[in-house]
Amino acid sequence: MNCLERTDAATPVGPSAGQLKRQGPLSWQEARARANMYGFLSNLFLIPPSQELIKWAGEDDRSHELSAAFGEKAAAELKAFAEDFRLQRDTATVIQDYWDLFRIPTGRYVAPFEDVYRGTPLDGKKSRGPLLGKHAIAVIRTYREAGAVLDERRKELPTHIGIEFAFMRFLCEQEASALGRSGGHLRRFGGNRKPREDGRYLELQGRFLGDHLNRWFPRLAQEICSNSQSRFYPGWISIAEAFLLWDTAALSNPRAYRNP
């Protein structure tokens, strides 16, 4: 199965405020919502932003929706973006930001690859690591373990941030499908006490966050915020950080494995 098929949502379709406040076991609806959010984050780094998305982020009432789902602090940067939004001016600036930050290796390029941000410590400081090193090998092994296949049409390396988010989307989609087959709620074990398929994908999600995304995304986030010309990408970085924090905590919550 291809884990990198493009999702074309012009606006984020992430968890609602109610879904972020989990009260019980994981459901297939929540897994689908999380897949949508990871798919949106993947596209944020893999394709230039559409004018529709930029306009959506610039609408005044969006900050209330984002604050309800992710918290006022996480939504503050996009709120500031909306308060001073001018469609023609900001569309050009945001699109240029995309190319300068993620595509063109010149002055403001942030090199969005895990390998780069997990270099070998030198005199107490992190150096930038080589591409396709040990971290890339570990990532590829995890992709294969999960049954994910890289889209041959994409030219990005496997440790590109957009690819890693796409892999999380794939895992959530697989979890949702497994949950649907099992009646809609996660149980860690089946009747024969063997690990269930849905629990396997949940375990892979937690492991990939802990072993990979959470190890380097904060440093990438700092680079993006330091080099952006507009508040658009720093705003979505704040949302992404809040979502990853929530998802990591939720996946480590034993209640997620509780029988309904």
Where are the regions that the model predicts?
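Surface/interface-facing alpha-helical segments and adjacent flexible terminal/loop regions used
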Residues: M1-P260
